[in-house]
Amino acid sequence: MTTPESSATSSVKIYFRLLSYVRPYVGIFLLSILGFVIFASTQPMLAGILKYFVDGLSNPEAVLFPNVPYLRELQLLQAVPLLIVLIAAWQGLGSFLGNYFLAKVSLGLVHDLRVELFNKLLVLPNRYFDTTNSGHLISRITFNVTMVTGAATDAIKVVIREGLTVVFLFIYLLMMNWKLTLVMLAILPLIAVMVSSASKKFRKQSKKIQVAMGDVTHVASETIQGYRVVRSFGGEAYEQNRFAEASDSNTRKQLRMTKTGAIYTPMLQLVIYSAMAVLMFLVLFLRGDATAGDLVAYITAAGLLPKPIRQLSEVSSTIQKGVAGAESIFEQLDVEEEVDTGTIELDRVSGHLEVKNLSFFYPQTERQVLNDISFSAAPGQMIALVGRSGSGKSTLANLIPRFYGHEMGNILLDGVEINDYRLRNLRKHIAQVNQNVTLFNDSIANNIAYGDLAGAPRADIEAAAADAYAKEFIDQLPQGFDTQVGENGVLLSGGQRQRLAIARALLKNAPLLILDEATSALDTESERHIQAALDHVMKGRTTLVIAHRLSTIEKADMILVMDAGKIVERGTHTELLAQNGYYARLHAMGLDEPAPAGAV
């Protein structure tokens, strides 16, 4: 159970960690602080100038600097207007320095946090994405970062500028009359208690707001990505209600936080102005030998205190929002990255793949997905995995490039355990094409030559497209290989998108090829062309094929029949048909059998 003390300690640690991101901008930050010091120093100056103004009304002949050469003749009525202009200019300089340079720090902080969060996404393990809502991930980069920078910069602006204003005003008041000023100081403990109470509520409510905002982003993202399904199945009303509920929940939580601030701020003002009322009574009652100017200056300085004190109390809301946002950001930044303890790096492997006694449980579950899997594939061999959905085929394919780590059994590539390879080097030797194709909102050429392939000669890109039978439709497009494909290739057909993914794999020219339902989105004619291309490409490469279609696997050197995470049969297409077993039954059904209940 989290105690108030541990929660407060946690908040302080989070806030100081957040402030560490300001370190690269420390020079600019110090300039902004200098600006706020200048700004704050003008507040007691304004109160002091009123003293001379009032005294000048009663004694027009009085001079401001009787002991200063060249200024001893300067009368109050002449000096006061000039000083007011100078004070205003001094205040303007401070305001510019403080606001401009703090804005530079704030924008730099937003950029740094967003880039670090995004870069972290690229090295997080697969299991993190399996269990984390994508809308919340996006919300952290967009919404949470904005709140965090408010705490790291805007809040500091208020704390420094208004805090220094309060300090300078209190110093001035103490110099004027220290006894009366102690009356004002007596209310500080009460203010501290009220601010502390409000801070706890603000942080709790801020966490709820962030979750609600993540839900809004998630629903919107899902609906936009699946708009065709939404329209095809008449899901508009359902999605409208789902989004309205998420947005309404966010609105209610925002209002609850606003309500908290709306209650605490007037209460705080009441306490401050009550103290002011007592102070004014004492000033008038105990005026002694003070001049009218002294009284006006003292009351003016005291009257300038409520505004900065109120702003200091309200900054708690900004800080707690930022701390709550920073907590979720640091949770993501602290997630352990993909394990990469390997040391071996090879320029090229032959593609000899061997799996020994491999078993696998998905993280955070007790269900065994793979059970004692063993097989080997020589370079140039094609191994086909068949079985009903949920039998473990795709899981096995995902273990080879180490999208998930295995602990039971071995996977060897050219006789080396894949965990001993450097992760980037291992994946360099593997090309993978999945049923769900990912294309980026870029040109066709850049989608084929993606990542490490960027910069490949145009001739190689076109050759890969030709081998994947994609060039024929690309040449018909207005801009050819420079045509923009839209978000995730929305401007292309399913078969066209699949052929671009295959072209990307062909351009990579990796010795190990994994085809996970790679031809499932193609029509019969396109599949025939692709199959011919794959027959050529697979020469000299180890190919692991996962398919539900007969034409894809009939030429395999070995077919592994999987069920419930085990290999139940193995052999060539002809051998397995002759056994008249599980494969023969799948073959009779077209190799596409539904998964049992609860299959993953």
Curated annotation (Swiss-Prot):
InterPro entries documented for this protein: AAA+_ATPase (IPR003593), ABC1_TM_dom (IPR011527), ABC1_TM_sf (IPR036640), ABC_transporter-like_ATP-bd (IPR003439), ABC_transporter-like_CS (IPR017871), ABC_transpr_lipidA (IPR011917), P-loop_NTPase (IPR027417), Type_1_exporter (IPR039421)
Domain ABC transporter stretches: 353-589
Membrane topology recorded in Swiss-Prot or TrEMBL: Multi-pass membrane protein
Alphabetical keyword list: ATP-binding, Cell inner membrane, Cell membrane, Lipid transport, Membrane, Nucleotide-binding, Translocase, Transmembrane, Transmembrane helix, Transport
Any one GO CC term of the record: plasma membrane
Domain ABC transmembrane type-1: 30-321
PANTHER family for this protein: ATP-BINDING CASSETTE SUB-FAMILY B MEMBER 10, MITOCHONDRIAL, ATP-DEPENDENT PERMEASE MDL1, MITOCHONDRIAL
NCBIfam families cross-referenced by the UniProt entry: MsbA_lipidA
Protein name listed in UniProt: ATP-dependent lipid A-core flippase
Species of origin: Pseudomonas syringae pv. tomato (strain ATCC BAA-871 / DC3000)
Gene from which this protein is expressed: msbA
